[in-house]
C-alpha cells in the first residue's frame, strides 16, 4: 500500500498530518504474517488492538513533528478466517511492525493442487478488498466525525460569540441607564440646591427688609419721643417763667403818695384779686399739664411695649395707627398748653401795667 499524507487542523494551534504506512501480507503454512512499515515511529508511539465484533486489527500511532505539527496513522486490517485469535502476537524491529496470526490448521502449500492455490489467492484478494473497503469506510467515518466535531466547534464558537455580543449589549445598555439615572439624580440635586439657595436668599432679603422697616419704626418713635420731650421741656420752662413773673407782681410793693411823702405799702388785696382773677387760667394749665404728664407716662409705657413688639416682629397695623393717633393727640395737647400759657402771660402783662396807673391816680397828693 502506498503512503499518503494529508494535513488537518483542529483550530487549537496544533496541526495533524495523516500518515498511511505501507503494509504487506505473507501467507505461510503455519501463520499469516502482516508487515507494516512505520519509519520514524517508536514502539511507545503506536498501539495495536483486536476488535472482536468485526474481527479486525486496528493499528494506531502518532508522533510530534516541528512547528506544532503531529504525524498520525489509523489503519485497520481484517483477520483471516483460519486464524487463532488468542495467539496473535507482534514485534517491532527495524521500523517494521510484524503481526503474526497463527492458523488453526496448518496447510502445506507445496502439496496443494493448483485449484487450491487459486482459491487461496482469490481469498487473499477478497480479504484485501474487504480490508480496503473497511479501511475506506473507517476513514470516511473518521472524516465525518471530524467534520461533525468541526461543525460542533463552529456552532459552539458562534454561540459563544452571540452570548458575548448579547452580554456586551446588555452591559452597554445597563451602563447607559446608569449614566442616565446618575445625570437625572445630579440634575435633581442641582435643582433642589438652587431652589434652596433661592429660598435662603429670599428669606435673607425678607429679613433685611423687615430689619430695615423695624429700624425705620424705631427711628420714627425715637424722633417722636425726642420731639415730645423737647416740647414738654419748653412748656415747663415757660411755666417756670410765668410763675416767677406772677410771684414778682404779687409781692411788688405799692407806693402811696401822702402829704408826708410816699410810703411803700403792699396791697395784698390787689394781689389776692389778681390771684382770684387768674385762678381759672392756672387751673386750666395745671389740668392740661396733669393730663399731659399722664399721657406722656402712658405713651412711654405704650412705646416700650410697642418697641418690644417691633423687636419681636409682632406689631400690627392697628397698633401702628394707635401710635400715630397718640402722636397727634400729644401735639394737640402741647399746642393747647402753649396757647394757654401764652394767654396767661398776656393777661398778666396787661394787668401789671394797669395796676400802677390806678394806684397813682388814687394816691395823688392834695
Curated annotation (Swiss-Prot):
Transmembrane segments: 322-342
sHSP domain ranges (all copies): 14-121
Keyword line: Cell membrane, Membrane, Plant defense, Repeat, Transmembrane, Transmembrane helix
Pfam families reported in the protein's UniProt record: HSP20
Tissue specificity as recorded in UniProt: Expressed in leaves, stems, and inflorescence, exclusively in phloem-associated cells (e.g. sieve elements).
Positions of A- repeats: 129-133, 135-139, 156-160, 206-210, 211-215, 216-220
Domain of life: Eukaryota
Ranges of compositional bias, category Low complexity: 346-366
InterPro entries per UniProt: A-crystallin/Hsp20_dom, HSP20-like_chaperone
Protein name: Protein RESTRICTED TEV MOVEMENT 2
Primary gene name: RTM2
